[in-house]
């Protein structure tokens, strides 16, 4: 199928990191040292598991460094700048296709207080990250004061349903979803420390 205007490309972090040379040989690097190199702040530690705030501002296990779906004795770091990566991929797709598209880069994170993992957007380009309902009214005519939907996170999670970890499909296209184009990116989803009730 050919690319269409307003297609949303959801691209896994793994192929972005691999394409940008973020693979590390664990015969040459200690896994703990890699975590330290990517960590801004350690939030919690239990046994071998470290919950860390990365240089990007993400709070996740082992600073987002992954050893799954990759050769043995290898580790994969997050992209240096996932939003820049998303913009690069979007520019390449638009140049090649002549169509206007959006790009979301996804990665799998755990969640506090709930079991299981979901995909989140760690980078984006060409799509508003948040759908803001503040000041609008619900179906009972109640004014909404706090509802902001993390649209690109929902897109990343929806795409995971067809990408599937075990078969490792690296790209999904979401078509037919209405969205607002924007110059903002996934960075605006990161809550400032001063606003974070749990830090």
What is the predicted role of each segment?
Residues 3-5, 16, 94-100, 132:
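Disulfide-rich extracellular domains of secreted proteins
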Residues 18, 96, 110-112:
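Short beta-strands and strand-coil junctions in structured, solvent-facing domains, enriched
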């Amino acid at each position: 199928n050919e690319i269409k205007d307003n297609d949303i490309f959801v691209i896994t972090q793994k192929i972005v990191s691999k394409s940008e040379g973020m693979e590390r040989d664990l015969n040459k690097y200690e896994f703990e040292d890699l975590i330290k190199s990517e960590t801004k702040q350690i939030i919690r530690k239990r046994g071998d598991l470290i919950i860390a705030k990365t240089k990007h501002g993400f709070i996740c296990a082992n600073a987002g460094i992954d050893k799954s779906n990759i050769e043995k004795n290898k580790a994969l770091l997050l992209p240096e700048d996932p939003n820049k990566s998303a913009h690069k991929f979007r520019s390449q797709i638009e140049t090649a296709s002549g169509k206007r598209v959006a790009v979301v880069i996804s990665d799998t994170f755990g969640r506090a207080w709930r079991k299981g993992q979901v995909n989140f957007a760690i980078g984006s380009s060409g799509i508003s990250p948040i759908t803001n309902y503040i000041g609008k009214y619900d179906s009972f005519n109640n004014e909404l004061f706090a509802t902001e939907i993390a649209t690109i996170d929902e897109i990343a999670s929806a795409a995971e349903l067809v990408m599937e970890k075990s078969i490792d499909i690296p790209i999904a296209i979401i078509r037919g979803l209405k969205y607002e184009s924007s110059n903002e990116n996934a960075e605006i989803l990161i809550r400032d420390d001063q606003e974070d009730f749990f830090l």
